[in-house]
Every structure is written in structure tokens, then in C-alpha cells.
């Protein structure tokens, strides 16, 4: 469950290391974002000489949350940290690699590129 001011790890090689959620997209009074939701983020920590710089604002898709996601069979998939993948204006991933596992809930037409780049799909 991600809300405004939440900090997330970045699960791609775009150069950003930590980002902060500045807006949950998808409604004027939408409060929380879960796995597969798009948020607006600001880069708070980045590595030198990378594409994403500190202070840049991007769209991002949430790929892992501590809250987790409940499956129709009743099981829950949870993670230790919150993580997101940075997206460009066309909602395509900026990085060329994805770090760590992602969930099957991302298997929509919009995020198949992220699922195919991920080392593990839970």
C-alpha cells in the first residue's frame, strides 16, 4: 500500500536508487496504490552518471509491496521492501534490466515488457 510521501526502492537499472511517491494516479482522491498501479515519483537518491538524476520526476509502476497482494485462491504474496520500476512518458520501462522478483498481477498488456525482463515471476 503506497501513498504520498512513501519511499520505494527502484527495481531497474535506470540509475535511481530510491524514489518518493508524490502522487497516486488514477482518480482525483485516490489515496493508495498497490502492485501494478502507476504513481508519480521524485528521485531522491541516484548513482552518478546515470539516466535518472536526483530531483527528476517520473511515472513508475509498483512491482513489490510490504502489504502484498491477495490471490483468488486465498494466498498472499508479500515482500520485505516496497519497489517500483521507472517509466517514461509512453509508460515503457526506462531501464533495460529488472532486479528481483515481480508478481503475476503485472501480466497485463501494458507491463509485459517488465514481466519478460524480470528474473523471476511469482
Swiss-Prot record:
Any single Gene Ontology cellular-component annotation: cytosolic large ribosomal subunit
Assigned keywords, A-Z: Ribonucleoprotein, Ribosomal protein, RNA-binding, rRNA-binding
GO molecular function: large ribosomal subunit rRNA binding; structural constituent of ribosome
CDD domains: Ribosomal_uL14
GO biological process: translation
HAMAP family, A to Z: Ribosomal_uL14
Annotated family: Belongs to the universal ribosomal protein uL14 family.
Quaternary structure note: Part of the 50S ribosomal subunit. Forms a cluster with proteins L3 and L19. In the 70S ribosome, L14 and L19 interact and together make contacts with the 16S rRNA in bridges B5 and B8.
Function: Binds to 23S rRNA. Forms part of two intersubunit bridges in the 70S ribosome.
PANTHER family: 50S/60S RIBOSOMAL PROTEIN L14/L23, LARGE RIBOSOMAL SUBUNIT PROTEIN UL14M
The protein's name: Large ribosomal subunit protein uL14
Gene: rplN
